[in-house]
Structures are given as structure tokens and as C-alpha cells.
UniProtKB/Swiss-Prot annotation:
Name the record gives this protein: Bifunctional protein FolD
Biological process according to GO: L-histidine biosynthetic process; methionine biosynthetic process; purine nucleotide biosynthetic process; tetrahydrofolate interconversion
One cellular-component annotation, GO: cytosol
Quaternary assembly: Homodimer.
Swiss-Prot/TrEMBL keywords: Amino-acid biosynthesis, Histidine biosynthesis, Hydrolase, Methionine biosynthesis, Multifunctional enzyme, NADP, One-carbon metabolism, Oxidoreductase, Purine biosynthesis
Gene3D superfamilies, A to Z: Leucine Dehydrogenase, chain A, domain 1 (3.40.50.10860), NAD(P)-binding Rossmann-like Domain (3.40.50.720)
Amino acid sequence: MEGNIVSGKAVADNITNILATCISDLKVQHNLTPCLIVVLVGDDPASQLYVRNKQRKAEMLGLRSETMLLPSTISESSLIEKIHQLNNDDSVHGILVQLPVPRHIDKNLIINTIDPKKDVDGFHNENVGRLFTGQKKNCLVPCTPQGCLYLIKTITRNLSGSDAVVIGRSNIVGKPMACLLLGENCTVTTVHSATRDLPDYCRRADILVAAVGIPRFVKYSWVKHGAIVIDVGINSIEEDGVKKFVGDVDFAEVNKIASAITPVPGGVGPMTIAFLMVNTIIAACNQSGIHGFLEKYLDL
């Protein structure tokens, strides 16, 4: 048996086409063009690449997108002032501070300086609190877990009663992913580096989400026959003198037992960017008093 390889790129491309129509109609019907500002502090090459990809996607859709480039030496207080200026600019609907930031800057302070209505990453304490108290419809949800859930629902619509295991407990993926799965009436277990007998937990999973940041961590013997496996990891390794990206799952082996599995690259990554665009549209509509517009185009 080989699993169904779930192309996040193909699903994200379909979402992109839908969003382009939505944005075009939003302009015509409401004279509204969603605007995303990405704040990039320093010149980290990986961050620059991520930002370029986000901006390219936004422009393809017809969003207004700009990058605010700031030196790595900027003071924390100056960065906070820049964010306040964006918070107070009614033409800006989404603000994203590309992580990581330099060590002298308090990441959590910066995240919570962003107006929660413009926090398209979904990391502000207010958005986190709303998600964890069952108010998904009244907050901006982190993009990667949102993309993962959408992928899972392309495989099976009814998740109620499923056993789901999330490997990883980060604020960015693990915790919100568990929360979203709970919202679908799954029985959710979160495992992590201190979990005893971790493979035993994984073997119970109908849905297994790996977000641990360790190359090929999840082995064939850990996976239930017919499980859905979502691989969030993207790890750079060198193999036979060649650099490549691999996930947190041993794809070649686990693909033999899973009913569906996401590849790396081309799995979760494109979905993260697609849902950043989704959040930007939601933020723009909410700030403009336009409710339920995106839901006419995309089933969230």
C-alpha cells in the first residue's frame, strides 16, 4: 500500500484562484483592497526569502503588500513606535513581523504590540485566548495550523471522534493545532520531547501531525495503518554530499502505511502562505464592517 500524497501546493493554488476572485469582487462591490505590511528586521537570508514569497503571492492575488525593511540595530522602542504607526493607519489591514527578530528585541512584546485586529499571524495573546476559548470565528487563527486543518478536510470531512496526535507543543503550530482539532470533536493528544513511550501514542492516531523540527523523526513503526499524516517540519540536511529539505516524517517508509501523507517540500508550506492571505482578507473585511464576505467563496 502507498498513501495518497496530498499536494499542499495544488490545494494552495486552488485557494489562490478563489481568493483572487474574492479580492476582485471586494474591490468592485466595496471599494476595498486589503493591505498587508510585512516588517523585516535585519538581513537574515531565510527571512528575506520567506518575505519575498509572501509578497509575491499577495501581489498575484491583487492585495496591496509592502515590506518595511529595518536595520538589525533598531532599538526595541523604535520598532514598537513603527508598529504603533501601522496600527493607527486605517489603510493597513494586516501587520506581520517576520520572525526571528534580533536578540535584543523581546519577541512577545513585539507580537503583542500589534493591534490584534491586524495580527494576521494570529500570535497576539487576544487571538490566542479567543481560539483557546472556542471563539475561532472571532479571532485570527495561526496560518500553519489553519492550513493543516484545511488539508485534512480535503481528505475527510468528518473528523468527529477521530484520535488525533500532535507531535510538538509550540505556540505557532502545536498548541493551536491541538485546539483546532478539538474544535472538530477529535480526541487530541499532544506529545513532546518529555513524553514517555511517544511511539505508543503515535500508533493510536487516526490523524498524526508532526511539528517537532527533527529530520525524519516519525518512523514507519510509529504509524497506524491507514492514518492521515501531516508533516509540518522542514529541515535542511546533507545526504550523499547533496543538500536537501526533508520533513519530520520518514516519508518514503511512512508512505507505505499511511492512507494520506503530505510531502516536504510542497505540502504544508504553501498552505501557510495561502492562509496568510486568507487572514489578511478577513482582517480587512472585519475592519471595514464587511462580515461573511470570504465565506461566500471559501469554506473555512
